[in-house]
């Protein structure tokens, strides 16, 4: 039998054909860590006893979870990264003011490219599969070993093939697509499998694809990956500073399952507490009052997400009972939002606008929920206590639904505030 897209990339790195279930050790093209995971990896790296990293251009250290530092402990975490970057001359250390949320920043900087094998000490590293590369999250010890050796080990995954048909309706985005899929297959529906997206992918922008690949892990997947097409090429061409290789799936590749997704059938989705699989169409939500809305994150903090929020919020006001927090995913996106007048409209509407940070998403800072509070967020997880108090609630939705709901004071379709 032929190979899936993921298996093709892993086979190329292994120098031979690999099979699902096989354990392999291969070279990596990028190793990533953030201000939570990298300090642990650095501590383990120092125990190995090597005097240099495998390649100072293939390591990315991105402080993003608690930046700007919220307290002494978080400041010390970033300082560990800073000192390590100086000691080993790490080229891709992104200091505060030049940083962004890691999974938006690395593609923007051209650091992850088609055909790459990318590991990151963060579960949403799977985001980069939007660019037709194999990207997956690992633990800090694996990150440490990879910084020393340039290698990582994997079990080759089986794959589920998602064949997309039709087109997105008005106010429907990649966030709605992935919530719809997770609602169908469940949070363990792709456990340790590759979610491979093909068919009418041209109906999805590159930002839609980043969002979908980002949340592959929420279905338990090892990785998410899209076919390479002209949309991928247009994005990569502007950013790539090195050569890359495009891989294609074999026509006779074997999949554990083939699932057809008709995009025409998808309405805006909302995931209810406390799992991303608890999805409902916006038409089935009912009147759910909210206290806070968060628009941003590695899932939905890109320029197109900011544009959607701007279109809905322009000339309107955030409901007096709602706090709206907006954080563009990178400094580059933030600056472009300033140039386009988005930030001005957000502030006029009554939103708080933040520099790039993961803070609210993990209940870290800049938007922590109190007991009994309810948030609607464009983030990727709504587990118990994810954004604050264990008796708070988090609902997940797209930027369009989030912006509209901030105006209404309860969860609504964007059509209701147009």
From Swiss-Prot:
InterPro entries: Acnase/IPM_dHydase_lsu_aba_1/3, Acoase/IPM_deHydtase_lsu_aba, Aconitase_4Fe-4S_BS, Aconitase_4Fe-4S_dom, HAcnase/IPMdehydase_lsu_prok, Homoacnase/IPMdehydase_lsu, IPM_dehydratase_rel_enz, IPMI_cat. The keyword Lyase applies. It catalyses: (2R,3S)-3-isopropylmalate = (2S)-2-isopropylmalate. Its EC number is 4.2.1.33. Binds 1 [4Fe-4S] cluster per subunit. One of its GO terms (biological process) is L-leucine biosynthetic process. Its cofactor is [4Fe-4S] cluster. Keywords: 4Fe-4S, Amino-acid biosynthesis, Branched-chain amino acid biosynthesis, Iron, Iron-sulfur, Leucine biosynthesis, Lyase, Metal-binding. Pathway: Amino-acid biosynthesis; L-leucine biosynthesis; L-leucine from 3-methyl-2-oxobutanoate: step 2/4. Catalyzes the isomerization between 2-isopropylmalate and 3-isopropylmalate, via the formation of 2-isopropylmaleate. Belongs to the aconitase/IPM isomerase family. LeuC type 2 subfamily. Heterodimer of LeuC and LeuD. This is 3-isopropylmalate dehydratase large subunit. It comes from Caldanaerobacter subterraneus subsp. tengcongensis (strain DSM 15242 / JCM 11007 / NBRC 100824 / MB4).
